[in-house]
């Protein structure tokens, strides 16, 4: 397999990493405070400068509060897409149905965008792959996609699930590319991180949970599935083991949910906080020395985290499926070790 030419990709990522902090700085609120001159000796001037100083302190506090509002507006889900300096797009409101608000939000839009991109991307790659002969080596985008697919197939699905991994490969590939693209689009200007919404990560983890339970039922049957809840202990300990094992069934999807949500949210908070330090402190030196360089560093780190979290979510999903569908040979090995 030929090596993928990544020079253009690296250049593109560097440009994005440089532009995002600058765009955020350019569009952020400028908190200008009037510098106070030396205090005159006259009481009348002093009485005027005192309220001015109080106003400066109030403006500084307002700047910090407004910076926090901007950060939370960027992180949380809402029905407004900001395209500064061009304006805003307000998404349509849908009346609640049975008390449930089903209005379209920016994270919902990003989920649709990710789904559309994946459909188009894999349709193009699949059509090119079908046209290739046995002697042709994949190049460009097809080569890159093949490398990622083979990595998930061999090093994730097959390594963690073992025999019968093919049944779960489509799900694992879908989860990997879906989470990866959601993470990456959150780093694009004017984009939003759908995986920074705990409802999205909880839904993905719920899919993994149900697939894991179905895999366990298929591998061991209802009797074996229920027997697993006892942990292979003496019946006298079942009153302790069954609640523990039952709770353990739900700790795995909870861990998947919190891990992805927290990691994708934390990075954006750090980047925006570093950027707004220069506005709050009103210092160009802070902006040049700390805000912009550190923001670029964290941004590049977020690119790595985007791939890493997609891999971790997929790897843990395959690991949970593999543990749930462990074959009898594995159980006999454990029984033999316990016997000896």
Curated annotation (Swiss-Prot):
SUPFAM superfamilies: F1F0 ATP synthase subunit A. The lineage of its organism: Bacteria, Pseudomonadati, Chlorobiota, Chlorobiia, Chlorobiales. PANTHER family: ATP SYNTHASE SUBUNIT A (PTHR11410:SF0). F-type ATPases have 2 components, CF(1) - the catalytic core - and CF(0) - the membrane proton channel. CF(1) has five subunits: alpha(3), beta(3), gamma(1), delta(1), epsilon(1). CF(0) has four main subunits: a, b, b' and c. Key component of the proton channel; it plays a direct role in the translocation of protons across the membrane. Residues 1-32 form the signal peptide. This is ATP synthase subunit a. One of its GO terms (molecular function) is proton-transporting ATP synthase activity, rotational mechanism. It is found in: Cell inner membrane. The chain crosses the membrane at residues 107-127, 172-192, 197-217, 236-256, 269-289, 296-316. It is a multi-pass membrane protein. One of its GO terms (cellular component) is proton-transporting ATP synthase complex. Gene3D superfamilies: ATP synthase, F0 complex, subunit A.
């Amino acid at each position: 397999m030929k090596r993928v030419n990544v020079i253009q990709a690296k250049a593109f990522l560097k440009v994005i990493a440089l532009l995002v902090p600058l765009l955020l700085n350019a569009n952020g609120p400028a908190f200008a405070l009037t510098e106070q001159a030396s205090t005159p000796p006259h009481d009348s001037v002093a009485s005027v400068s005192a309220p001015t100083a109080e106003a400066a302190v109030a403006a500084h506090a307002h700047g910090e509060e407004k910076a926090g509002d901007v950060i939370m507006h960027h992180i949380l889900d809402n029905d407004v897409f900001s395209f500064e300096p061009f304006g805003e797009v307000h998404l349509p409101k849908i009346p609640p149905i049975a008390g449930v608000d089903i209005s379209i939000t920016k994270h919902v839009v990003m989920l649709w965008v990710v789904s559309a991109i994946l459909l188009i991307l894999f349709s193009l790659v699949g059509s090119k792959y079908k046209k290739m002969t046995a002697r042709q080596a994949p190049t460009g985008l097809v080569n890159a996609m093949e490398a990622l697919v083979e990595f998930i197939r061999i090093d994730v699905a097959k390594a963690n699930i073992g025999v019968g991994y093919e049944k779960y490969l489509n799900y694992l590939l879908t989860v990997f590319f879906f989470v990866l693209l959601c993470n990456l689009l959150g780093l694009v200007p004017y984009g939003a991180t759908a995986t920074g919404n705990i409802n999205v990560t909880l839904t993905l983890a719920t899919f993994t949970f149900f697939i894991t339970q179905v895999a366990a039922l298929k591998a061991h049957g209802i009797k074996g599935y229920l027997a697993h809840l006892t942990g292979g202990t003496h019946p006298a300990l079942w009153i302790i083991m069954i609640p523990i094992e039952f709770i353990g069934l739900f700790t795995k999807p909870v861990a998947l949910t919190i891990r992805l949500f927290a990691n994708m949210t934390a990075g954006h908070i750090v980047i925006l906080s570093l950027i707004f330090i220069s506005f709050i402190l009103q210092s160009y030196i802070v902006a040049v020395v700390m805000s912009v360089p550190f923001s670029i560093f964290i941004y590049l780190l977020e690119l790595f985290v985007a791939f890493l979290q997609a891999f971790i979510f997929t790897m843990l999903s395959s690991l949970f499926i593999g543990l749930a569908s462990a074959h009898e040979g594995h159980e006999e090995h454990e029984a033999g070790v316990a016997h000896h």
